[in-house]
């Protein structure tokens, strides 16, 4: 960007589950921590223990036994602005150790987010943190940049929301975006439920984090769900054991693939929606007939909920079944896709051509928060 160390842009990808933050031009985020704010469940007994009234991120996670944990971002939308400010404050001052008033800041948001949401983000950045400039980018578009493409369809599945976003020459096609409020957190909840049927009880916010870990370590997507169920019923070859923090060992079998199967069959959790393979197909079908071929050949997976082993093969199989038989279909699953939104942001914010795109403090002062709709596409 420049030889000046001072003006590196900051990139902050605020996910429903994890905040990924760092400096533009880096190849990975410096700070990755849970988007959690925890408050003590009980009044502190011991005087002088210096108990804080709130904890953020990893500290909240490690003290989860005595805290009530809340996620300020639900389904990709910020629902609790006070907590969100705490998270940003923690990001700038404790994790990155920078003064936000010295750095342009790139934030990300989910496609089809309410307009008021990005206005409020803009307002807080300029008024609370006094950033010199900022920009709000759409997550899926950044993931596509990170994969080195400007055209393709992104399946972005995070902790709070899943989308299929067709992008052509760098622009998202809003009329064809499919949004599904079914993502990692719902899968964790579903796994909690089906483990209960096995006789293991997980209820508190702290225990939910244990189940999330089980999900991340042991779950996978079956290529053929019925076959896999039959295999699981007739042999114990698919069973795996997991040691809980208290030393108890639990065994998990068909739950390993029943949990992420929900992505393809949302009826498992009582949702009437189509699965991610169908929404991808529907999204492509809403696009102009001339660009469909390019979209089919560039299905890019992004986000933590696409990290399940077997998901790319299953998507390939399902979309091939829906698409015209002569169509070439390619699923791209970059190994770093957990962070591809952040990486795309890092690339974008360090491009020389992007520097005129920032919303400056001056522009904000003249036009107010609504400037974000004019400048950020």
Swiss-Prot record:
PTM remark: Oxidation of Met-46 and Met-49 by MICALs (MICAL1, MICAL2 or MICAL3) to form methionine sulfoxide promotes actin filament depolymerization. MICAL1 and MICAL2 produce the (R)-S-oxide form. The (R)-S-oxide form is reverted by MSRB1 and MSRB2, which promotes actin repolymerization. Monomethylation at Lys-86 (K84me1) regulates actin-myosin interaction and actomyosin-dependent processes. Demethylation by ALKBH4 is required for maintaining actomyosin dynamics supporting normal cleavage furrow ingression during cytokinesis and cell migration.
Residue positions, PTM N-acetylaspartate: 3
Modified positions (N-acetylcysteine) in chain numbering: 2
Keyword terms of this UniProt record: Acetylation, ATP-binding, Cytoplasm, Cytoskeleton, Hydrolase, Methylation, Muscle protein, Nucleotide-binding, Oxidation
Main location: cytoplasm
Subcellular localization(s) per the UniProt record: Cytoplasm, Cytoskeleton
Chain positions with Methionine (R)-sulfoxide modification: 46, 49
GO molecular function, one term: ATP binding
CDD domains reported in the protein's UniProt record: ASKHA_NBD_actin
Residues recorded as bearing Tele-methylhistidine in the entry: 75
Pfam families (alphabetical): Actin
Signal peptide positions on this chain: none
Reactions this protein catalyses: ATP + H2O = ADP + phosphate + H(+)
Quaternary data: Polymerization of globular actin (G-actin) leads to a structural filament (F-actin) in the form of a two-stranded helix. Each actin can bind to 4 others.
Stated family: Belongs to the actin family.
Protein name as catalogued: Actin, alpha skeletal muscle
Lineage per the UniProt record: Eukaryota, Metazoa, Chordata, Craniata, Vertebrata
């Amino acid at each position: 960007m420049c030889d000046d160390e001072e003006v590196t842009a900051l990139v902050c990808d605020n996910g429903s589950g994890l905040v990924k933050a760092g400096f533009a031009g880096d190849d990975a985020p410096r700070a990755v921590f849970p988007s959690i704010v925890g408050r003590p469940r009980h009044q502190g007994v011991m005087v002088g223990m210096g108990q804080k009234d709130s904890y953020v991120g990893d500290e909240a996670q490690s003290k989860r036994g005595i805290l009530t944990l809340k996620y300020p971002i639900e389904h990709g939308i910020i629902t609790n602005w006070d907590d969100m400010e705490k998270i940003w404050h923690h990001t700038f001052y404790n994790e990155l150790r920078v003064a936000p008033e010295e750095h342009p800041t790139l934030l990300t948001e989910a496609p089809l987010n309410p307009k008021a949401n990005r206005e409020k983000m803009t307002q807080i950045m300029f008024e609370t943190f006094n950033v010199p400039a900022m920009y709000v980018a759409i997550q899926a578009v950044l993931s596509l940049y990170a994969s080195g493409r400007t055209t393709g369809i992104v399946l972005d599945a995070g902790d709070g929301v899943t989308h299929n976003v067709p992008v052509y020459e760098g622009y998202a096609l809003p009329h064809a975006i499919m949004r599904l409020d079914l993502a990692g957190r719902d899968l964790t909840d579903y796994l909690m439920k089906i483990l209960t049927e096995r006789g293991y009880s997980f209820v508190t916010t702290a225990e939910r984090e244990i189940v999330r870990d089980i999900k991340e370590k042991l779950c996978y997507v079956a290529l053929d769900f019925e076959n896999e169920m039959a295999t699981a019923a007739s042999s114990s070859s698919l069973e795996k054991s997991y040691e809980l923090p208290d030393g108890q060992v639990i065994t998990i079998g068909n739950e390993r693939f029943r949990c992420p199967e929900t992505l393809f069959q949302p009826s498992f959790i009582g949702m009437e929606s189509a699965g991610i393979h169908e929404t991808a197909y529907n999204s492509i079908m809403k696009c102009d007939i001339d660009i469909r071929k390019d979209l089919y050949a560039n299905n890019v997976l992004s986000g933590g909920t696409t990290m399940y082993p077997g998901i790319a093969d299953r998507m390939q199989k399902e979309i091939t079944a829906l698409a015209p038989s002569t169509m070439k279909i390619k699923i791209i699953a970059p190994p770093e896709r957990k962070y591809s939104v952040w990486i795309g942001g890092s690339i974008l914010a360090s491009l020389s051509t992007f520097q005129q795109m920032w919303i400056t403090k001056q522009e904000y002062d003249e036009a107010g928060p609504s400037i974000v709709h004019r400048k950020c596409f």
